[in-house]
Amino acid sequence: MKLTQATTLLLSLGLSLPVEGFSLSRTNAVGPKPPFRPLPASTPRNKTCQVQSNGDGTDDAPYILAALKQCNNGGKVVFAEDKEYTIGTALDMTFLKHVDLEILGKITFTPDTDYWQENSFKHTFQNATTFFNLGGTDVNVYGGGELNGNGQVWYDLYAEDALILRPILVGIIGLHGGTIGPLKLRYSPQWYQLVANSSDVLFDGIDISGYSSSENEAKNTDGWDTYRSSNIVIQNSVINNGDDCVSFKPNSTEILVQNLHCNGSHGISVGSLGQYQGEVDIVQNVLVYNISMYNASDMARIKVWPGISSAMSEDLQGGGGLGSVQNITYDKMYIENVDWAIEVTQCYGQKNQTLCNENPSNLTISDVYFNDLTGVTSGKNDPNVGTIICSSPDVCSGIHATNIDVKSPDGDSGFVCTNVDEEFLDVECASSS
């Protein structure tokens, strides 16, 4: 059962994309499910630029910028396989057009936490910051090389101060038309990838891993976070991390996620949404297909803040925002040692259920489909394997669950169901709260 289609496909990830470039349509590289809209093709590349390296751990950012400017508009920039590159300067690469970055070697970001807190790129959402911003039109990044965020110094520092600004390893910011992968991503200080204000981007063959070597956990290491982006495809990837495998943040639309192997995560999550009062968060038209999830807190997860201010942690607070979650499908999923097979909540960050019910979410959930989910939970929440908690039936409708064959190690299969129409749930609503 472990050898799902996703696992089988991942055995050949190294062959999934041609290292010489992308002469074919990006749409043809997507499968088995098609993208919501066709992805634009790349134009031919007709020149090559090699990136120099000091080779001694000092900053190579000037060489990278020089090569990008030289080969922009129709070229390929190569990071050699036999070289290691160091980045010690925040790089604005949002000017790119019709260019490839072939990363064959290893790129490491310096562990200068003071510099990066001051100079990393600041984004408005959830205090996100990035080592670099990569954007523009028709940009491909591939080669199978490694980006290393030197995360250990950040894991230890965050344990001392939860308000530090930890950079995201990969910032795809304002990219319209692009392919990312195959690549290895290692030891990100926080999220591995932020995809913001972007469209028509394919992620294919991403290998994510990086755990703490000290007693301080590597926290908030999401694989992907999409934000204000549309027509994004994430496929054929392996993720070993400690937070969401993929998270659809506000205003993510037409997102396809397929053929992933996730381990140690918090699941594939819609949200969190409704965090900021006065903001309108929309996530709609999302398909999650053929996912294997191991040793995780959740498989399929939707997390929405209630209508009252709540605190998830010292650096994560909110509630009262507006918006909607609509037309979300999770299909063909396998779990092993996962706490919740399905978790839907409109009370995110609020432990007092009575208070949540008295202040229901301002953000509606509708037309959600969970199909063909199999496997065994961890047993942590026995006798229940799933939970669907709405803050009010007025803001939560059309949640469907079919062909759900999930049990705990003891054979239990109950669901917690609150303020939800059980007519569409092919599960045992064994308890309510």
From Swiss-Prot:
One of its GO terms (biological process) is pectin catabolic process. One of its GO terms (cellular component) is extracellular region. Glycans are attached at N46, N127, N197, N251, N263, N290, N295, N327, N352, N362. PbH1 repeats lie at residues 229-250, 252-272, 325-346, 360-403. It is found in: Secreted. Disulfide bonds join C245-C262, C390-C396. This is Probable exopolygalacturonase X. It comes from Aspergillus flavus (strain ATCC 200026 / FGSC A1120 / IAM 13836 / NRRL 3357 / JCM 12722 / SRRC 167). The lineage of its organism: Eukaryota, Fungi, Dikarya, Ascomycota, Pezizomycotina.
